[in-house]
Structure formats: structure tokens, C-alpha cells
Amino acid sequence: MKFIIKLFPEITIKSQSVRLRFIKILTGNIRNVLKPLVEDVAVTRHWDHIEVRAKEESRRDLVRDALTRIPGIHHILEVEDHPYTDMHDIFEQTLAMYREQLEEKTFCVRVKRRGKHTFTSIEVERYVGGGLNQNIPSARVRLNHPEVTVNLEIEDDRLLLVRGRFEGQGGYPIGTQEDVLSLISGGFDSGVSSYMLMRRGCRVHYCFFNLGGSAHEIGVKQVAHYLWNRFGSSHRVRFVAIDFAPVVGEILEKVDDGQMGVVLKRMMVRAASRVAERYGIQALVTGEALGQVSSQTLTNLRLIDGVSDTLVLRPLIAHDKEHIIRLARNIGTEDFAKTMPEFCGVISKSPTVKAVKARIEAEEEHFDFAILDRVVDEAQTMDIRDIARQSEADVVEVETIESLAEGDVVLDIRAPDEQEAKPLQLADSEVICLPFYKLANAFGDLDQVRRYVLYCDRGVMSRLQALYLREQGYDNVRVYRP
């Protein structure tokens, strides 16, 4: 099998040295992606295209699909390579391939040549087109908007019959731009923004702020691995997980309600910037869109960026949610995002849309930055290639109950302001208010003879916290969903 790779047009307008560098990098990327899929693959670069040849015909579809997902490729031509003697031989070979496709259809012939010949491209188009028109009575020539375009490429003494054209990802080859660190949550926005930077030639590493439990972390790892495996597997990247529950707990205890959202984002940027500096990464990537939530106003974004000198890229800044979801659907992350949990108790009730720098800094003076230093120092870094193996491990499950048994103790793990606004009142059961950010440290002090059922408004945080406790060896926990 043989494929002709056509370059993304922006590559072709670069200077000679830059163009050659981009083509060399793209050639290497193609080799890296195809090497695990097919043996004895030959990838040869030329000035205006790249050739891919392989012997295993059974893997043709697999190779074609992989090529369509490599950034830097405008389109792929699947071709049959044959020698020819003259224009009539070209016509006969074309007729043999296209006869069935052209029945009852309008068509035109398009020819591209490389090398020296005794004929022009237009002469071949006219000769072959006229022959097809005469030998296929039901076919008709239409030069504008035909139903079938017969694409031929002539390279010296070889005829390339194009079996099909397949669109690529476009963009720049990964590795032509510098590395970035994507703050990924598993939702619609962060997945799409990560893809957009990969498509622009960046090697994208991932930083995940874990707010509770392995289930969410595994879900986000699967999104990151999917994006890497589908669009960026030509390069090795890192996945960095930071346990941010202690930071959230400190914010909920020490920071005024209206300032929590901005302070939390500032802490995330601080932490991510340190990770980026550790690995020599040039910029952060977020999925923020202007005005989408309270922390994403211009005033608040400026304050968030002010805590670090690291460049923060926001490729979705002017996109609306509907467009972002459509992009997620196109790249295949929509289903992941739909099932990704949102956390109750993390978002403030009355967030400010126009934070004041002096007020934010005053609130942050109450924050113990030793906690932030500790979680960054304890961040877990792994090669993203190891995620697939790790995800195959069994995830501990936890039982969800709708009614309470005699003797059950309900742990209300919502934040204190939620507990005050909407108290959980149960006539026949004991209720203990224990915010989720204190649960991990305080649960061991409870009477372990009793059975504890965890409650929160949406049931997401309670399930994640119950999973965490089960992983720590506590079997006396359930999730309460009345």
C-alpha cells in the first residue's frame, strides 16, 4: 500500500529552512505513530509531500485512520503505483479502476505531474477524460462540481491512481512549537483546548488538580490518554496529578465566600506554574471562555494571571459553549465530559465577577501557603503511556442506599455554608456535620463499630469520598441518596 501525504498549507509558505525542519519533524512523527501498527513501514520525505509505503495490506484501514489523526497533514491520498508507457496506457489503467465508480455519474479528470514529460497535465486530462466519456456511455463530463473527481498523479515514469482522498487534522506537526502544560479537568473545555494546542504543534503535558478520590482521577486520566493516543502519540508526555483537597479545605475555612473562586484559580495557576518550571514547560493552557462563569471575566482573569510570570494560553476565550461541545463531539471527548463529575461544595454561593486585587490579596494572607507548597512537592508524575495499564485495574466500588438502617450515622460532608443554608434533618438517625475536606483526617477518630453513610447534594463528592475511604481500608461506609 502507498499513501501520499500532503502538507498543511501554512507549512508550504515558510522559509526553506523552516519548511524543511517542519517536514523532517512531521516525517518522524508519522514513523513514531505507524511503527507500533505495521512492520517495515517506509516513510520518505519530499519537498512538497511525504510518501508512506507498507507491505501489510490487511492493515491498510488502520494506517489510513492513524494518518488522518496526525497534526500537520492537510490530506492523504491513497494511491496505486504503476508504471506506464504513454497517455493511452494511462487512460486504460484509469478506465479499469474507475469504470464502476463513474456509471451514471458526472465526472472530471484532474492531473498533477512531477518530472519531465512529453505531454502537459491538461493534455492528459483531455485525453483520459475523453476516453472515459466514450467508453462509459452513462457517464457525463462536468468540469464544475462533478459527482466524481478522477485524480491522477504522474511522477516521472510512474502513474499514481488515487483510490481515495482523506482529510487530515491540518495544523503544525507536534514538536515544531514548544511544550505546554494543560490544566485538565476532564470536562468539555479542557479537552478541546488541549486538542487545539496539539493541533498547533505543541507537545501537551497534563496537570490535574484532584479534589477527591481515585474515581475522578481515573476518569481524567482516561480523557488525557485518549487525547494523547488519538492525536499526540508521536511524543512522550507527562501526566501530573496534584491532590488539591487540602488547598480547597483551607480556602473554605479561611477565605471569604465571594472571593473563593478567584483565589482557587490563583492557587491552581501558582501550582501549575511551579510544575511547568520544574519540567521546562513554557506555557499553561486552560479551557476558560470569556464570561462563561464568574471567575472568567476580564477583571478576574487578569488577577488570576497576575500570580505567575508563566504565559497562560486560553484558546477557547471567544468560543461559546455550544461550539465547544460541538468540537468535543468531533474529537471524541464529548462522552467523557458528559459523565465527568462536578463537585458540590467547592463553588462559592455569591462569587464576585469583578474582584479587587487588594481584597483578594488580603484574603490570601489568611491562607497557609505551606499547604500549597506541600501538595506541589507531593505531586505524582507519570508517563501517560502507563495510564492504559493502570486504568485496567479494578476500581473499588461502594454501595449507594436510598433508606437508612437502624444505627446508621449520616455524615453530612457538605461545606459549612451549605449545611447552614439547607440543614439535613433526619428524625430517626444521627447526623454528624463533617465537611469533605476534613473527612480523610477525622474519619479514623470515629467509632468504627458504627456504619457511616455519606451525604451531599448531588451525590458526587460523597461517592468519591466513600471510594477514598474504602481504598484506605474502611468497609463501614456507604453513600446516602434519598
Curated annotation (Swiss-Prot):
Reaction equations catalysed: [ThiI sulfur-carrier protein]-S-sulfanyl-L-cysteine + a uridine in tRNA + 2 reduced [2Fe-2S]-[ferredoxin] + ATP + H(+) = [ThiI sulfur-carrier protein]-L-cysteine + a 4-thiouridine in tRNA + 2 oxidized [2Fe-2S]-[ferredoxin] + AMP + diphosphate; [ThiS sulfur-carrier protein]-C-terminal Gly-Gly-AMP + S-sulfanyl-L-cysteinyl-[cysteine desulfurase] + AH2 = [ThiS sulfur-carrier protein]-C-terminal-Gly-aminoethanethioate + L-cysteinyl-[cysteine desulfurase] + A + AMP + 2 H(+)
GO CC, alphabetical: cytosol
Active site (catalytic residues): C456 (cysteine persulfide intermediate)
EC class: transferase
SUPFAM superfamilies noted in UniProt: Adenine nucleotide alpha hydrolases-like, Rhodanese/Cell cycle control phosphatase, THUMP domain-like
UniProt GO BP: thiamine biosynthetic process; thiamine diphosphate biosynthetic process; thiazole biosynthetic process; tRNA 4-thiouridine biosynthesis
Residues in Rhodanese domain copies: 404-482
Subcellular location: Cytoplasm
Annotated ATP binding sites: L183, I184, K265, G287, Q296
GO-annotated molecular function: ATP binding; CCA tRNA nucleotidyltransferase activity; tRNA binding; tRNA-uracil-4 sulfurtransferase activity
One Pfam family, short name: ThiI_fer
Documented EC number(s): 2.8.1.4
Family designation: Belongs to the ThiI family.
PANTHER family with a match to the protein in the record: TRNA SULFURTRANSFERASE
Role: Catalyzes the ATP-dependent transfer of a sulfur to tRNA to produce 4-thiouridine in position 8 of tRNAs, which functions as a near-UV photosensor. Also catalyzes the transfer of sulfur to the sulfur carrier protein ThiS, forming ThiS-thiocarboxylate. This is a step in the synthesis of thiazole, in the thiamine biosynthesis pathway. The sulfur is donated as persulfide by IscS.
Protein name: tRNA sulfurtransferase
Organism listed in the record: Edwardsiella ictaluri (strain 93-146)
Lineage: Bacteria, Pseudomonadati, Pseudomonadota, Gammaproteobacteria, Enterobacterales
Gene name per UniProt: thiI
